[in-house]
Each structure stands twice: as C-alpha cells, then as structure tokens.
Amino acid sequence: MRANVELDHATLVRFSPDCRAFIVWLANGDTLRVFKMTKREDGGYTFTATPEDFPKKHKAPIINIAIADTGKFIMTASSDTTLLIWNLRGRVLSTINTNQMNNTYAAISPCSRFVASCGFTPDVKVWEVCFGKKGDFQEVTRAFELKGHSAAVHCFAFSNDSRRMASVSKDGTWRLWDTDVEYKQQQDPYLLRTGRYEEASTMLCRLALSPDGQVLALASGSSIHVYNTRRGEKEECFEQVHGQCITDLSFDITGRYLASCGDRAVRLFHNAPGHRAVVEEMQGLLKRASNESTRQRLQQQLTRAQEALKSLGALKQ
C-alpha cells in the first residue's frame, strides 16, 4: 500500500500499535499528519490522511515522534527543550520543559508509562504519563533520572519490560541501568554496568538495547559495535555498514535481528550475541536448578540457543 503526502514530504514515520494507522512529521508543514487505513471500492485497502493536521506547536526542529503502545497518546520532541504529549485527536495534553539546554533524543517506554529525554546535560530524565482507571489523562510527573555521566548524553534505550535502560554519552562511556525501582519512594535507578565507547567522545551515536536487555548495539558514523551487557565486552564490530552515517538503530521485538538505517537503505543483522547471552544465562541457571522439571525447561532453552548459533555458524567451541 502507498500513501501520498500531498504538497509536502515526511521526515519521520511511526505506526500505531495495531498498524492500521500511522503518523508522519511534515517537513514543510512542521506538524503531524495522521493516516488511517480505509477500504477501497474494489475491496482493497489504502491509507488516507485525516481531514486536519495537528496544530503547529513546536518552535524548533523536531528530533523524534512516537505513539504509545497502549495507543493512548503521542509524543513529539524538538531540539530546544520541549516535549509535547498529545491525545490522538491533536490536542496537547501536557508540555514538558526538559531543562537540558537542548534535546538530542526522546522516546516513549515500551510499557507506555514513561517518556524520557536526553540532551546537553549529563543525565537522562524520565517522566510518568498518568491515566485514570477509565483511561482519562491525569498528569505528567517526574519519575527518575539516570545520573552519572560526565558529559552530554547522545542517546538511550529501554528494554522491552522497561526494567532496564542503557545510555551512551560524550564522555566516551555507555551505561546499563536497573530501572525497576520504587521511584515514588524516591528510589534511584542502580548502575549495573559501564563500558568504554571512545567513538562517542567525538561523534553523535545511536543506541539500541535488545528486548531482554542482554545486548547493546552502538552506532557511530557508518559502523556498529555490539556488546554483551552481562560481561560488558564487545562481541561484534561491523565496519562501514552504510555509505553514509547511520541514522537509526533498532532490535526487532523478538530480539533475533538488529536493523540499521542509513543512505536510504535498511540492513538486517542476526543477533548472534543475543543467542550467546542466552547460552551463558541458561548454563548458569542449570548449575543452580533444584528440580528436574526446571532443568528440562532450561535445557530446552539452552539447546534452542545453541542450535540457532550453529545455524548462523557462530557457535563458539
């Protein structure tokens, strides 16, 4: 299916959770446009723009847009210090001033509870987007911050359950955090691991965290470096993947693949480090398993991961 962006073009695209609609950021219009799936007379389907675009609210270039997996709200972020939370009909629910001098990245957590941003300051700020039992929006409140970097933060990412976060900074380090904390009781996230990534000192970086939080991918320029977060060690390095700088990096929802975007192309990589991480985890759990049923279940997972590595020619003896 194709959708025409009349008298403009899109710079960012995000699908709704059910994939029956998507939003785009208009390059010339400087606002959001919604496209919904509609049925044609011949029985096929197409995407049609809604009658009205969202109102213009941002005063600086946009850096990211996102739709919550619950479908309850949309986030837009600009390069000044502004994050906007919208309902699906184009009404601003909340305006967030990040106080980070400028934003470099912003995102919604996979659980849809949080929005977060990073920028010129050496931290990542996270807010909770609160809804009532009936699904009505209530407020946006501060949740927690990731503190410890000594320079601006380029990018961050959540694990699929939002219990882990990773960040990469201009100080030349990446960090893995335990964010499964009682933030309403003022409990701060725990630092689990720190690793060196010197390229971050001189170049803008993109970061992706696997759904289970066990693999971290970092992109700078046209190269990708992949780390095991349990050990903090680099496992893979893909040089000159694209002819131009990589603009985005993401794991698929299963964690089996890593995708990179650049020079008008998307490239897919098998997540062999992810399978190795599962092998390490299952071997450790097997040593501590106390009953046979648990051992059988763990052995099955171990075997599947080993078979996946063997099929990729990546099984280390």
PLM feature segments, named:
Residues 1-9, 39-59, 92-104, 131-148, ...:
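Inter-blade linker and blade-boundary elements of WD-repeat/beta-propeller domains
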Residues 7-15, 59-67, 101-108, 151-157, ...:
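Canonical WD40 repeat/beta-propeller blade segments in eukaryotic WD-repeat proteins
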Residues 17-18, 69-70, 110-111, 160-161, ...:
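Residue-level detector of Asp-centered blade-edge/turn motifs that repeat once per structural unit
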Residues 25-28, 77-80, 118-121, 168-171, ...:
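Conserved strand-to-loop turn within each blade of WD40 beta-propeller repeats
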Residues 32-38, 83-87, 124-129, 174-179, ...:
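WD40-repeat beta-propellers
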Residues 186-198, 205-208, 214-245, 250-252, ...:
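Structured C-terminal portions of repeat-based eukaryotic scaffold domains
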Residues 236-237, 244-245, 252-257, 263-317:
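Terminal intrinsically disordered, low-complexity extensions flanking WD-repeat/beta-propeller proteins
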